[in-house]
Amino acid sequence: MADQQLDYASAKFVTSAPDISKLPPDSGIEVAFAGRSNAGKSSALNTLTRQKALARTSKTPGRTQLINVFELTTGQRLIDLPGYGFAKVPLAVKEKWQRSLSEYLQQRDSLKGIVVLMDIRHPFRETDQELIYWAVDCDLPVLALLTKADKLKQGARKSTVLKAKQAAIAFNGDVQVEAFSSLKRIGVEQVEEKLNQWYSKEYDDE
């Protein structure tokens, strides 16, 4: 069956959950967005959904430790995972978040793909690599977005993306790399295309 063409502008906030046990019932399809606290995750979600304030952009990276749930249509959700890797977050909070993330990736049947956002100037930091390896171990496809792509000139951007694609081979999984810019709307079409594939999986699996 052809991939669904979803209207991402229809996304609506549903709930904020402190951990996986407080999420909506594990049915339908979820796609999760994850990234370091300053990777531009909230801006990417707002750009994708064409809503300026769907996901709150915090001036204090690492402040939000809740899982935010947005619904596109019945049973189709976007999951905004808490930012990770920020130095000012207490160690106990980091450890709790790591446990929660691990549980979510391993146990959530409705999770069909994860978007990992990384600053194009600092891709594949240790925490990013850990997350991608976890996802691959759970047989989850990954879309790695190199955010803030407008910060690099076109030649440098292409070179960085090419190097990142080569580096992604080492994960030995379904890891696609794309440049992304919320400001210039670079890569939005590629994100929509990949998400449409993932949201069509329920039909392919039946």
Curated annotation (Swiss-Prot):
The keyword Cell division applies. GO terms for biological process: division septum assembly. GTP binds at residues 35-42, 62-66, 80-83, 147-150, 180-182. It comes from the Bacteria. GO terms for cellular component: cytosol. Residues 27-201 form the EngB-type G domain. PROSITE patterns: G_ENGB (PS51706). CDD domains: YihA_EngB (cd01876). It holds the Pfam family MMR_HSR1. Keywords: Cell cycle, Cell division, GTP-binding, Magnesium, Metal-binding, Nucleotide-binding, Septation. GO terms for molecular function: GTP binding; metal ion binding. Mg(2+) binds at S42, T64. Its cofactor is Mg(2+). InterPro entries: G_ENGB_dom (IPR030393), GTP-bd (IPR006073), GTP-bd_ribosome_bio_YsxC (IPR019987), P-loop_NTPase (IPR027417). Necessary for normal cell division and for the maintenance of normal septation. NCBIfam families: GTPase_YsxC. Belongs to the TRAFAC class TrmE-Era-EngA-EngB-Septin-like GTPase superfamily. EngB GTPase family. This is Probable GTP-binding protein EngB. It comes from Idiomarina loihiensis (strain ATCC BAA-735 / DSM 15497 / L2-TR). The gene is engB.
